[in-house]
Amino acid sequence: MAPYHIRKYQDSDHRSVVDLFRRGMEEHIPATFRHMLLLPRTLLLLLGVPLTLFLASGSWLLVLLSILTLFLSLWFLAKYTWEKHVMNCLHTDMADITRTYLSSHSSCFWVAESRGQTVGMVAARPVKDPLLQKKQLQLLHLSVSLQHRREGLGKAMVRTVLQFAQMQGFSEVVLSTSMLQYAALALYQGMGFQKTGETFYTYLSRLRKSPMINLKYSLTSREGDL
């Protein structure tokens, strides 16, 4: 296991952070494709459309082309989902990471470095909701390089956020992650995060039945555990 060091983000990290974030999101395209492929409505289309075309035309070529078109459409939708998420982040909070996360003592952005390479990242900022009864910190953009998985780095990055939240006087750490991010969900729940609900942020996510899972870690009930 290669040694790593977790530190605050610097402007010189921007390109490597963006590359790491983009690669991490693109890893979920195959899982999203498989999830959509196994939906009942998709299976119905894969059976119904080719069968209808064959009965109407008797052409196996049309059948094969229709199946290929359906598969390509599903792959495009899966790819579009994650590419859109990346572009949205790069044009909002990650457009200027220093200004968004390092201009206030209550937010931060960390990178994990190993042998001069950026191999992990995570961010945190306060939840701005006047109706909240408790002070919440939102965990965002956790990503670990594929070559450094299963080394405890993901847990170390999350623990960094939890310790920061405790030091800044937050009561809870919250986050949202796609149900398709299986490894991330297992990591969070294994560290004590509790599911609080599900949210469909887009029509496409509702159509493919893949909600965002909302999770919460209560710091007030775990004092001394960190």
UniProtKB/Swiss-Prot annotation:
Catalytic activity annotation: L-lysyl-[protein] + acetyl-CoA = N(6)-acetyl-L-lysyl-[protein] + CoA + H(+)
* Any Pfam family matching the protein: Acetyltransf_1
Entry membrane topology: Multi-pass membrane protein
Q: Where in the cell is it found?
A: Nucleus membrane; Cytoplasm, Perinuclear region; Cytoplasm
* Enzyme Commission identifier(s): 2.3.1.48
Matching Gene3D superfamilies: 3.40.630.30
Question: A single GO CC term, please?
Answer: nuclear membrane
Q: Which GO terms describe its biological process?
A: axis elongation; gastrulation with mouth forming second; negative regulation of cell adhesion
User: Is Acyltransferase tagged as a keyword?
Assistant: yes
Q: Which InterPro entries match?
A: Acyl_CoA_acyltransferase, GNAT_dom, NAT_camello-type
Q: Which UniProt keywords apply?
A: Acyltransferase, Cytoplasm, Membrane, Nucleus, Transferase, Transmembrane, Transmembrane helix
In terms of PROSITE patterns, this protein maps to: GNAT
The membrane spanning regions, by residue number, are 36-56, 58-78
Q: What does the protein in this record do? A: Has histone acetyltransferase activity in vitro, with specificity for histone H4.
Record family assignment: Belongs to the camello family.
What the entry lists under PANTHER family is as follows: GNAT FAMILY N-ACETYLTRANSFERASE, N-ACETYLTRANSFERASE FAMILY 8 MEMBER 3-RELATED
What is the protein named? N-acetyltransferase family 8 member 3
Native source organism of the sequence: Mus musculus
Gene this protein is translated from: Nat8f3
